[in-house]
């Protein structure tokens, strides 16, 4: 059980930022703010959300993409991170699992996720 002051602080933190609704299997495009010395720039990272864990301020999600030379790159982001400039849902995937860790072992067409058609 959390202290009520900590709970009030966390609730205030959650109100400040809104995120689009997404789940595991969705393809996301994340804008990450990178600060280099005096300059700031936005770098985009596009991949499939393979896991969402935690709740409240401690909530995180993991995004996986296949980079250069077919090397898998996974990044874990705090849900309410200040470095996330933007989050876009590009495609909504249809999966039957909450954690898609099995995609790590798959290559090529086997790693595809069906898209939800509206």
UniProtKB/Swiss-Prot annotation:
GO terms for molecular function: structural constituent of ribosome. Keywords: Ribonucleoprotein, Ribosomal protein. Pfam families: Ribosomal_L19 (PF01245). GO terms for cellular component: cytosolic large ribosomal subunit. InterPro entries: Ribosomal_bL19, Ribosomal_bL19_CS, Ribosomal_bL19_sf, Translation_prot_SH3-like_sf. HAMAP family: Ribosomal_bL19. Belongs to the bacterial ribosomal protein bL19 family. This is Large ribosomal subunit protein bL19.
């Amino acid at each position: 059980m959390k202290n009520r002051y900590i709970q009030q602080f966390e609730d205030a933190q959650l109100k400040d930022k809104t995120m689009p609704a997404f789940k595991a299997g969705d393809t996301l495009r994340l804008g990450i703010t990178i600060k280099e010395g005096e300059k700031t720039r936005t770098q985009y990272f596009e991949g499939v959300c393979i896991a969402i864990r935690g709740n409240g301020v401690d909530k995180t999600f993991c995004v996986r993409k296949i980079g250069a030379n077919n090397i898998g790159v996974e990044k874990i982001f705090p849900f309410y991170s200040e470095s996330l400039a933007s989050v876009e849902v590009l495609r909504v995937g249809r999966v039957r699992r909450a954690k898609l860790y099995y995609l790590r072992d798959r290559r090529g067409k086997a790693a595809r996720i069906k898209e939800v058609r509206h």
